[in-house]
UniProtKB/Swiss-Prot annotation:
Subunit structure: Monomer. Can also form homodimers and oligomers.
Keywords, sorted A to Z: ATP-binding, Hydrolase, Magnesium, Metal-binding, Multifunctional enzyme, Nickel, Nucleotide-binding, Nucleotidyltransferase, RNA repair, RNA-binding, Transferase, tRNA processing
Protein name (database record): Multifunctional CCA protein
Binding site for Mg(2+): 21, 23
EC number per UniProt: 2.7.7.72, 3.1.3.-, 3.1.4.-
Catalytic activity: a tRNA precursor + 2 CTP + ATP = a tRNA with a 3' CCA end + 3 diphosphate; a tRNA with a 3' CCA end + 2 CTP + ATP = a tRNA with a 3' CCACCA end + 3 diphosphate
Xref: PROSITE patterns: HD
Role noted for this protein: Catalyzes the addition and repair of the essential 3'-terminal CCA sequence in tRNAs without using a nucleic acid template. Adds these three nucleotides in the order of C, C, and A to the tRNA nucleotide-73, using CTP and ATP as substrates and producing inorganic pyrophosphate. tRNA 3'-terminal CCA addition is required both for tRNA processing and repair. Also involved in tRNA surveillance by mediating tandem CCA addition to generate a CCACCA at the 3' terminus of unstable tRNAs. While stable tRNAs receive only 3'-terminal CCA, unstable tRNAs are marked with CCACCA and rapidly degraded.
Domain HD: 228-329
Length: 411
């Protein structure tokens, strides 16, 4: 029996990159030997065990064989005759197909170290194209290691395109797509994830509402980048600088979906794209089984981002109505996230990344003012039922009017 550290831990150790989990492969052992050594079986489809002390995963070396379309259509073979090289051959990328023995010696049969040095994401073998999840994974690795200079090998990108054209991505279930997308949103450069999916054709299949934005023009006076899809990626990049919260990043990415359905004869204007986009955001989130906190923020940003941009132009009633519609009183944290998304949108434009966005602070200040209105003061005055609600509305409106009177004029 021989035990090797494999996968991400070895890769990131060679990169000098932080890693939090360690995976191990065991060569020359049987399931019974693992049980006799105190390991706990956890693998449903193939022999995987938890170490009795560290709780880290130890898998018996195995081979895979494609039996049906999709990422679940595999048969596995695992016994003591499977070699380390055979186990590493089934892995997705060469940089993930490196092992380290208990003495610290590197075993690298597929030149993963070379690809780490040249910053290349390259498939190990043609078996790469048998699992469509690998398209999402390589896009996520491209997003994670972009700042280190990693790029996808041309032949690997060509394989990804072939997989998309063969319909492999159509077999991905929504939960798996969302799992990879949500993880990508937490990487340093999630825009690279989206760009990679677009380059191989997968974005059209998985997120057609977003893919539709590329090539649609916006007024150059407001959007020097012109292309709506490019703007979506710039907004995402700015959101990443403003917040590490994946909900904020997701909402910034899809805030302009409504521009994808603007009739061509109206281009480059997109009047009403906010409400047009809400149904598309809902549609996308339904298809991906997106968690509620992502969906709710994305819908709010889509519907009201231009209200925030026009904050200083809104009259008191409209501003109050907007704050209430955004549920700012009950959900102040989400309201702050909304304001960050609006800032990311405004600054996610070529050459305007550092332009001040005082509208966000103004919106937050307006919310702070109406938070000062307490129902107790009206109850103490003897008001009841609907009278309390009316009095609170009037008091809040007065707070907004005073704020508007005191505000410094903005351009």
């Amino acid at each position: 029996m021989k035990i090797y550290l494999v996968g991400g831990a070895v890769r990131d150790q060679l990169l000098g990159y932080p890693h939090h989990e360690q995976d191990w492969v065991v060569v020359g052992a049987t399931p019974q030997q693992m049980l006799d050594a105190g390991f706990k079986p956890v693998g449903k489809d193939f022999p995987v065990f938890l170490h009795p002390e560290t709780q880290e995963e130890y898998a018996l070396a195995r081979q895979e064989r494609k039996t049906a379309p999709g990422y679940t259509g595999f048969a596995f073979h695992a016994d003591e005759t499977v070699t380390l090289e055979q186990d590493l051959l089934r892995r997705d990328l060469t940089i993930n197909a490196i092992a380290m023995d208990e003495e610290g010696t590197i075993i690298d049969p597929y030149n993963g170290k070379r690809d780490i040095e040249t910053r290349t994401l390259r498939h190990v073998s043609q078996a790469f194209c048998e699992d469509p999840v690998r398209i999402l994974r390589i896009a996520r690795f491209a997003a994670r290691y972009h700042h280190l200079g990693f790029r996808i090998a041309p032949e690997t990108l060509a394989l990804m395109r072939d997989m998309v054209q063969a319909g492999e991505v159509d077999h991905l279930v929504a939960e798996r797509v969302w799992k990879e997308l949500s993880r990508a949103l937490e990487e340093q450069h999630p825009a690279i994830f989206i760009q990679t999916l677009r380059e191989c054709g997968a974005l059209h299949r998985l997120m057609p509402e977003l893919n539709a934005l590329f090539g649609i023009p916006q007024p150059e006076a407001h959007h020097p980048e012109v292309d709506t899809g490019v703007h979506a990626l710039l907004a995402l990049e700015r959101a990443c600088e403003l917040s590490s919260t994946p909900e904020v990043r997701f909402a910034a990415l899809i805030h302009d979906l409504g521009k994808g359905v603007t009739p061509k004869h109206l281009w480059p204007s997109h009047h009403g794209h906010e409400q047009d986009g809400v149904a598309l955001v809902e549609q996308l989130c339904n298809r991906l089984s997106t968690p509620n906190q992502f969906r709710e923020l994305a819908v709010a940003v889509c519907a009201y981002h231009t209200h925030c941009h026009r904050a200083f132009e809104l009259n008191a009633k409209t501003l109050l109505k907007t704050l209430l519609a955004l549920d700012g009183l009950r959900r102040p944290e989400r309201f702050q996230q909304f304001c960050l998304c609006c800032q990311a949108d405004a600054q996610g434009r070529t050459g305007l990344e550092n332009r001040p966005y005082p509208q966000a602070a103004y919106f937050l200040q307006a919310l702070e003012e109406i938070q000062k209105v307490d129902a107790k003061m009206f109850v103490a005055q003897g008001k009841k039922g609907a009278e309390i609600g009316e009095a609170m509305y009037s008091a809040r409106l007065q707070k907004i009017k005073l704020l508007k009177t005191a505000q410094t004029p903005h351009e």
